[in-house]
Amino acid sequence: MKQKSISMKKMILTVACALSVLSSIAQQQVKIAPDGFDKSNNTILKGKIDTISYVSKTVGTTRKALIYTPPGYSSQQRYPVLYLLHGIGGDEKEWLNGGVPHIILDNLYAEGKIKPMIVVMPNGRAMPDDRAVGNIMAPDKVQAFANFEKDLLSDLIPYIEKNYPVLTDRTNRAIAGLSMGGGQSLNFGLGNLDQFAWVGGFSSAPNTKKPEELIPDPARASRMLKLLWISCGDKDRLLSFSKRTHEYLEQHKVPHQYQIEPGDHDFKVWKNGLYQFARLLF
């Protein structure tokens, strides 16, 4: 009888372990955008890309950013905002030139898969000469990416909220980015939960703070976040930075979406990240 009891316990433990593995696999199921998601479609309504200039007291100059307004944009309607950040070798045009966010979003609108939003693509290198020229890894240029936090919060967001019909509460403000911009998004978003409820990091770079610095209070983060998205390519040499953040979040039971998908440190992964992230917003 005792032997049967031991066998039964072993069987229950085995089944429980199997279910746990299956649950983990289900949670990590890779989501890939459908064919054509990033191809222009001339039969649908399209949003508009404009260049804006704003005075940055942080940097002491006038700075540029791109802004995407959705199809059917009206000054009589108020919109949530996504701040979409570039990588260390880019500027405010990197997403536009390499990631065609306007096409991805236009297609999603046409399919009724996202809510109308304004997307701001700033220059995350907050220094007087913010062009990606010369040694982009120079200490002052790397530091400028950290300095952008103040420029974003004190200069750019107030400019957008003064000049565009946007919703101004944290639940209608998102931040996401690729590589260096992914690290910025995690650092700034998780570091300012009173300002952002939606945070996404695509292939986040080494500038990403250590998990215990990003999320010193897991319970508070769990309460305040509407969405935390972390994704990376399986061949990306920077994968360890996303992985360590995910493992910390999992250990501390902070809800988040994490996916490792086929790809390297490239726009194939980042475009899919934007596609998936945008569908979950607001």
Please provide the spans of the model-predicted regions.
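Bacterial Sec-dependent N-terminal signal peptides
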Residues: M1-Q29
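Non-catalytic cap/lid and distal C-terminal segments of serine-dependent acyl enzymes
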Residues: Q27-F282
